[in-house]
């Protein structure tokens, strides 16, 4: 399991030209689910998403987390993150979880984040073709694993 997180001033995701999730300042997290990802890993990733310090404090240092700022969290499932890109000129998706397993894990991650974060948790639509619009603040982008 991995999450590509971006600190944003705003982000939204649309399906069929209709916005299905949007946030103001906060984090956009693209989530890749791999076969065999476990409930403890989901909980750990949720902790990292909410607790990872990527927001500036009064001194300008990255010392504040999403939990500290109360910013929004936009979670978007993206199976291509889990692709094997080591060889050849075409990605292999054999390292991504099957759709049913991935959807179940993604929904569990969303539920955990919603339970723990009062700042608002929005999502895309699992399995849909989505258009993600964002303004990356910094830019600040990190790849997290549980």
Swiss-Prot record:
CDD domains: Dtyr_deacylase (cd00563). This is D-aminoacyl-tRNA deacylase. It is found in: Cytoplasm. Belongs to the DTD family. An aminoacyl-tRNA editing enzyme that deacylates mischarged D-aminoacyl-tRNAs. Also deacylates mischarged glycyl-tRNA(Ala), protecting cells against glycine mischarging by AlaRS. Acts via tRNA-based rather than protein-based catalysis; rejects L-amino acids rather than detecting D-amino acids in the active site. By recycling D-aminoacyl-tRNA to D-amino acids and free tRNA molecules, this enzyme counteracts the toxicity associated with the formation of D-aminoacyl-tRNA entities in vivo and helps enforce protein L-homochirality. One of its GO terms (molecular function) is D-tyrosyl-tRNA(Tyr) deacylase activity. GO terms for cellular component: cytoplasm. Its EC number is 3.1.1.96. Its main location: cytoplasm. It comes from the Bacteria. SUPFAM superfamilies: DTD-like. Pfam families: Tyr_Deacylase. Disulfide bonds: none annotated. Homodimer. It catalyses: glycyl-tRNA(Ala) + H2O = tRNA(Ala) + glycine + H(+); a D-aminoacyl-tRNA + H2O = a tRNA + a D-alpha-amino acid + H(+). A Gly-cisPro motif from one monomer fits into the active site of the other monomer to allow specific chiral rejection of L-amino acids. A motif (Gly-cisPro motif, important for rejection of L-amino acids) lies at residues 138-139. GO terms for biological process: D-amino acid catabolic process; tRNA metabolic process. PANTHER family: D-AMINOACYL-TRNA DEACYLASE 1 (PTHR10472:SF5), D-TYROSYL-TRNA TYR DEACYLASE (PTHR10472). Keywords: Cytoplasm, Hydrolase, RNA-binding, tRNA-binding. It comes from Xanthomonas campestris pv. campestris (strain ATCC 33913 / DSM 3586 / NCPPB 528 / LMG 568 / P 25). NCBIfam families: D-aminoacyl-tRNA deacylase.
């Amino acid at each position: 399991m991995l999450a590509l997180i971006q600190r944003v001033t705003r982000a939204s995701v649309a399906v069929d030209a209709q916005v299905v999730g949007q946030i103001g300042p906060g984090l956009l997290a693209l989530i890749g689910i791999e076969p065999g990802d476990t409930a403890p890993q989901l909980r750990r990733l949720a902790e990292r998403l909410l607790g990872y310090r990527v927001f500036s404090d009064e001194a300008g240092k990255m010392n504040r987390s999403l939990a500290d700022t109360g910013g929004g969290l936009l979670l978007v499932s993206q199976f291509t993150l889990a692709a094997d890109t080591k060889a050849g000129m075409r990605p292999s998706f054999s390292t991504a979880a099957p759709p049913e397993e991935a959807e179940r894990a993604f929904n569990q991650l969303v539920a955990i984040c919603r339970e723990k974060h009062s700042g608002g948790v929005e999502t895309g639509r699992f399995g849909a073709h989505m258009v993600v619009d964002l303004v990356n603040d910094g830019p600040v982008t990190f790849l997290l694993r549980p």
